[in-house]
A protein has these predicted regions:
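Short, Lys/Arg-enriched N-terminal segments with co-localized hydrophobic residues
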Residues: 1-12
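Conserved Rossmann-like nucleotide-binding pocket used by diverse enzymes
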Residues: 12, 36, 61-63
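A short beta-strand-turn-helix
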Residues: 13-30
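Conserved helix-turn-beta segment immediately C-terminal to the redox Cys motif
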Residues: 27-30, 47-65, 71
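Short pre-active-site segment immediately N-terminal to redox-active cysteine/selenocysteine motifs
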Residues: 29, 36-39, 81
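Conserved redox-active cysteine motifs that mediate thiol-disulfide chemistry
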Residues: 35-49
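Structural micro-motif
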Residues: 77-86
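Non-catalytic, surface beta->alpha helical segment in thiol-disulfide oxidoreductase systems
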Residues: 87-115
């Protein structure tokens, strides 16, 4: 696995900390951040869904923020429930998906944001 929130060749999402989160969301490329918690059942279901989707999008940054550890990031971004997937570009939120959704919804969203 790679550090700083990058996904490895197996597309496993890394845990973002405050530093890696700030670095990645400010990049010019699309960054997907999954806000989740260890106690959240739907968050656990979402992980393999996103890993599968991300195989088709190797050129985006992707990572996860554990809201129990980094509640400051969740509060800053107005996260009110998990799972929530937020898309950033150049440090700006460009879209958000709340709740567990099918893989196709995430793929379509990423496609629309990359065009």
């Amino acid at each position: 696995m790679l550090k700083n929130g990058l996904i490895n060749k197996n597309k496993v999402m890394e845990q973002f900390d405050s530093t890696s989160y700030q670095e990645k969301i400010k990049e010019d490329k699309l960054t997907l951040v999954k806000y989740a918690a260890n106690w959240c059942g739907p968050c656990k279901v979402l992980s393999p869904i996103l890993e599968g989707v991300l195989k088709d999008f190797p050129n985006i940054n992707a990572g996860e923020v554990n809201i129990d550890i980094h509640s400051d990031l969740a509060i800053k971004d107005g996260i009110r429930g998990v799972p929530t997937v937020v898309f950033y570009k150049n440090g700006v939120v460009v879209d958000k998906m709340v709740g567990l959704q099918p893989a196709q919804a995430y793929s379509q969203k990423i496609n629309s944001l990359m065009n």
